Amino acid sequence: MATPIRWNQRGRVAPYGGSKRTDTPLRSLALSLTHVARAALSEPYMLTIEHKRIQLSRLPKTFDGFRVVQLSDVHHGPFSDREQIERAVETANRLQPDIIALTGDYISKERHYAAPCAEMMGKLKARFGVYAVLGNHDHWTDAALITDLFRAEGITVLVNEGMRFEKDGAAFWLAGVDDSMVGLEDISLALAGARDDEMKLLLAHNPIVLRRAVRASVDLVLSGHTHGGQVAIRGERATTRPRKRLLKGLWRQGNTQIYVNRGLGTVVLPIRYGCPPEISLLELRSK
């Protein structure tokens, strides 16, 4: 017959009846694993706001302080429910952004989640609009359906295309590429029409685009896809290998910077550890 257990005042497990047991390495390991499991199951609900100031030498002074809120990898489905997403939308709106950038993977694989996800994304509010690109999961599900639903909600979906973003006589180029993993990314097409000397902001789901963005003289790339690793065993900068280095946060290669958002949802398992879901508040500063 199993012995009931309780937590004593020091956080150790002891049997009812008053007798104390000496901790063993195995018991300590079991407690540690229990703690990790609880943290991993609760962390997907621990929404965080990452506020970064990004210096851009070609950003016109008119846009100094321009606020971009980025959301990524919503993955609406069994692991990412309406309550989580609606809370993220409300949080994003409270940040009063100039634009909102959505960087792909809105659903995981079930088409019936597309319409409610689009409805929730349609409640995002920004001074100059909401802009989106598609991710690999969107293509694996139904990219055309998601694109149509988002556009019906007033969201500008950029599919290898760009536009000149103008304000008070100043401008920069805002572009978005289709997903790299499905072989549809075309930076040249997205930047067609951009002037050589103007600041270029690129939305791309997969950060693997970075090297091509550098060659195309893009100033800033906003990406997602990685979920920050979803489970982080090592420190954030424990490795210098390029692909590992681009799991999350702000990085630079040459004159190009990239910000990789950890995303809101999860895949495979509904867990996160050391990688809480993120809303990015990116404040663009001119040098």
Regions found by a protein language model. Name each.
Residues 1-68, 78:
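Acidic, histidine-bearing metal-coordination/catalytic regions of metal-dependent phosphoesterases
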Residues 148-155, 159, 167-204, 210-211, ...:
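Binuclear metal-dependent hydrolase catalytic cores centered on His/Asp/Glu-rich metal-binding motifs
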Residues 47, 56-69, 155-156, 163-175, ...:
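Beta-strand-turn-beta hairpins that frame and shape the catalytic cleft
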Residues 98-100, 105, 198-201, 219:
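Conserved acidic residues
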Residues 46, 51-80, 177-204, 209:
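Mobile, glycine- and charge-enriched loop segments
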Residues 152, 207-284:
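Conserved beta-sheet core of the metallophosphoesterase superfamily
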Residues 72-76, 104-106, 136-137, 161-162, ...:
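Active-site metal-binding loops of divalent metal-dependent hydrolases
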Residues 62-156:
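Membrane-embedded segments
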